[in-house]
Design a protein with these regions (language model features):
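NAD(P)+-binding Rossmann beta1-loop-alpha1 motif at the extreme N-terminus of oxidoreductases
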Residues: 1-52
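Rossmann-like NAD(P)(H) cofactor-binding subdomain of soluble oxidoreductases
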Residues: 45, 52-117
Length: 117
């Protein structure tokens, strides 16, 4: 299974750590992140960091939307423009499915950072 995280904050990091500790290879996980400090940390974990424009080329089974709520709707639109057949799992708090541009292709989940423990 190939997974791409769009946004790699605390919840995404907890999910990535969980995937890695359960045997998912780093080669199966990619990240799209704007914060250069986080990009360096992701690369230290041997995770692939890609640009949104390359999303369609990578052929991911699942794209996990883990950005701040203020960025979620535009990020989701950009994901569908870059890779219209993407399945999206959103972990963004406070945004109902009907607010997304393609709500039938979005799955909503609400983990929290204590899930890491």
């Amino acid at each position: 299974m190939n997974v791409c995280f769009v946004g790699c904050g605390n919840i995404a990091q907890a999910m990535i750590d969980g995937l890695l500790s359960n045997g998912i290879s780093t080669s199966s996980i990619a990240c799209i992140e704007r914060n250069q400090r986080k990009v360096e940390l992701l690369k230290e974990k041997n995770l692939k960091v890609i640009e949104l424009d390359n999303l369609a080329k990578e052929n991911f089974d699942l794209v996990i939307l883990a950005v701040k709520p203020k960025d979620a709707l535009s990020a989701e639109k950009n994901i569908f423009q870059a890779a219209p057949n993407s399945k999206i799992l959103t972990v963004v708090a406070g945004i109902e499915l009907n607010k997304y541009s393609n709500p039938n292709s979005v799955i909503r989940s609400m983990p929290n950072t204590s899930s890491a423990f």
